[in-house]
Amino acid sequence: GLGDVYKRQLIMYKIIEVKQSVFEDNNKDANKLREECKDKGVFLLNVMSSPGAGKTTTLSRTLERLKDTMRIGIMEADIDSDVDAKTISEYGVRTIQLHTGGMCHLDADMTRQGLHEMGMEDLDLAVLENVGNLVCPAEFDTGSTKNVAILSVPEGDDKPLKYPLMFQVCDVVLINKMDVLPYFDFDVDKCKKNILYRNSNAKIFKVCAKTGEGIEDWCNWLENEVKALKE
């Protein structure tokens, strides 16, 4: 009857209200954190991708190249393991593990806690390796200076069309695993077109974390961005 319809509407309304206030509060926190990072000269990089796209390997390559030129700290977000944090800590950079307790993303407040725990005053570059997921992490602003999405060749060139928000919020997209291009039906030009359709300002780098292809261009870009923040 009508009562049921009303109840259903009420439930929907409540859910929307709660979600909206969560986003609004998070956006305020994120903007505050972005200001704090800028004031302290810390470049906060938020790295997102689906599981297995090569976040940790790409980060390892990036660290190899940049760890001697700047002070870097890494925050590894995982639902419940520390495998990635162990891998990264072998590079001798400050690494902390953030367990999200089952949540599929990090928000600005968790990121802030992680940064303070790491001692952000002593960092030039703080990298947040977000939870492997193409949906939730894109919805929550972490307060980052820049967002990076890693898209691997085996995932397909249509990912930017299927996950619009991820590619809309990203400043940079790394097309990773270029070494397996011959074995997959992946059109690089089409992929670039799809990315730019979602976000005409996105920077795109073709890389292979395994062989090191394209990593230098990506690292040069990042190094210049980190310097520019301090000017």
Where are these regions (language model features)?
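Nucleotide-state-sensitive switch-loop elements of NTP-binding domains
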Residues: 14-35, 40-48, 53, 57, ...
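Conserved Switch II/interswitch segment of TRAFAC-class P-loop GTPases
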Residues: 133, 143-161, 171, 178-185
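Cofactor-binding loop segments of dinucleotide-utilizing enzymes, especially the Rossmann-like FAD-
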Residues: 77, 152-153, 209
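Canonical P-loop GTPase G-domain recognition
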Residues: 181-231
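Short beta->alpha connector loops at strand-helix junctions that form conserved
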Residues: 97-100, 151, 176
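Short, glycine/polar-rich helix-capping loops at beta-to-alpha or helix-loop-helix junctions
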Residues: 81-85, 159-163, 187-194
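Short, small-residue-biased leader/transition segments that mark boundaries at the very start
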Residues: 1-6
